């Protein structure tokens, strides 16, 4: 076996392993927050807003009143002023897994994959949002300083 033939399978294994690791959803919560960002890249507030209002992504407007949106839900707290009430670390935990703060929360666990009920086979083991998407949403929520 030549060196070239030995390297190709090793590279394939590394690529597959990196893809599995990229889907890993570990985070360390401290109290009511996740102090460390989930990614090395900072969140992008514009992308975060897009995720929040997109019904195929975050779908936050189904339950929350969202500043600037005309159609929204009213069964969850309004998001106006949330950036003044909560730190980015607190926002991160609420987006990742709100049940860590309130066990009765109906909010989806956007970055949790275990302990969930009635998950379609195609979505098992996959978070609703990627780590970068969580950081993007947190970046946008942190900009919401005004109560209205």
Task: Describe each model-derived feature in a short phrase.
Residues 1-9:
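Bacterial N-terminal signal peptides that target proteins for export
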Residues 8-17:
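Bacterial N-terminal signal peptides
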Residues 19-22:
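Sec/Tat signal peptide C-region and signal peptidase I cleavage site
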Residues 24-55, 148:
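Electrostatic cytochrome c docking/interface patches
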Residues 46-50, 89, 93, 135, ...:
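Solvent-exposed, polar/charged alpha-helical surfaces in well-ordered, non-transmembrane soluble domains
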Residues 55-59, 67, 133:
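Short pre-active-site segment immediately N-terminal to redox-active cysteine/selenocysteine motifs
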Residues 61-100, 106-120:
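Gly/Gly-Pro-rich "capping" loops immediately C-terminal to redox-active cysteine motifs
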Residues 112-148:
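C-terminal capping alpha-helices of c-type cytochrome domains
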């Amino acid at each position: 076996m030549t060196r070239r033939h030995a390297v190709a399978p090793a590279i394939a294994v590394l690529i597959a392993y990196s893809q599995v690791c990229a889907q890993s959803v570990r985070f360390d919560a401290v109290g009511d927050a996740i102090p460390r960002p989930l990614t090395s890249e900072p969140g992008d507030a514009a992308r975060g807003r897009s995720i929040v209002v997109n019904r195929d992504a975050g779908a936050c407007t189904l339950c929350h009143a969202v500043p600037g949106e005309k159609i929204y839900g009213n069964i969850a707290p309004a998001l106006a002023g949330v950036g003044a009430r909560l730190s980015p670390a607190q926002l991160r935990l609420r987006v990742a897994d709100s049940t860590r703060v309130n066990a009765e929360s109906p909010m989806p666990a956007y970055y949790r994959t275990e302990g969930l009920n009635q998950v379609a086979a195609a979505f098992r083991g996959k978070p609703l949002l990627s780590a970068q998407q969580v950081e993007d949403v947190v970046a946008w929520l942190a900009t919401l300083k005004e109560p209205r």
